[in-house]
Amino acid sequence: TATGLDFQWTRPDHSGYYDAVANAFNSDETMPDVVLLSSDYYALYASNGFLWNMTDAWNSSETKKSGRLISTADNVLSALMVNGEDGTKAMYGFSPYRGNACCTYIKKAWLDAAGINTADVEGKTLDFNTYYGYLKQMAANKGHYVISAPGFISNEAPYTNYLPEFYQQASYTFYKNSSGQYVDGFAEDKMKEALQRIQTAVNDGIIDKESVNNSTSNARDKFYSTDAGSESGVFTYWAGTWANTLKTQLATKGLDNELIAIKPIKELGTYVERIAPCWCITTAAKNPEGIFKYFIDTMLDGGDVQTLWEYGAKGTHWDTKAETVTLAKDDEGKKTKTYEEGQFHFLPQ
């Protein structure tokens, strides 16, 4: 393999991932050597003494000395400095990428059906009233909700990322203000106003009231739904490769897959990037230095291992050999594409 390592990989079901992690941490016998944690769980397990302090290992690492890191790497890594069991800030995890952010996708077919000019939406910075007016037009045309979100609150920072136009500048939890003081964002007027906007949208039939129980997969299924009574038309979800995934899934179901990723509305200003999930070495590991050197420090080696982490395994997820690949079905049936020798291409999964 590219890593040269022999290890056991445990991959719990996505929806029950942190329940599985919590169960594994109940005993030294079941605690893994390495675990992938989101920001909240990362801070929690670090403060409880379950994670190995990799600060010194990072400072002397080949990756840090390589000169390969981009200018934003410091921002990613500084966010990983959290309090340990002794209250001292240290680096207990490593993330080889930025956290990404959610953006809002609107189905063009829904705009068209509601008589909304695409040119008035695409590439425009809308204010909330204009945006909400478009949502009401689409709801009136379809006769039901427009948005079905994966919960009213996300389970990781920044928490408000699945309904950004409604939360706007509100903060769900404590944050450091411009004076350097920590304040309770949930108790502020901005949050009260945000909750009122959400309540109004539910009462107006804009937001699916079942959003409170939705998982991410439930919300995606409603966006892909071929049932006109349950299909949603506006979905705030991850940017980047997820845009292609959403389009592919819509096409597979025979739905129009043209999506418009709108700019952040005026009151929001910018989509908020989450703190990247990070790879952590637990205190149960018998050789944390070795794990760091051969598992963590090779993730951004600029070669085969980095390629593995970014694109998957050659011959399984991608290849460069000359071949004709049959793509997944869409509304027009199967399609094939031919690649020349040396041409990078993904393989259907």
Stretches found by the model and what they are:
Residues 1-349:
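Extracytoplasmic/secretory soluble proteins
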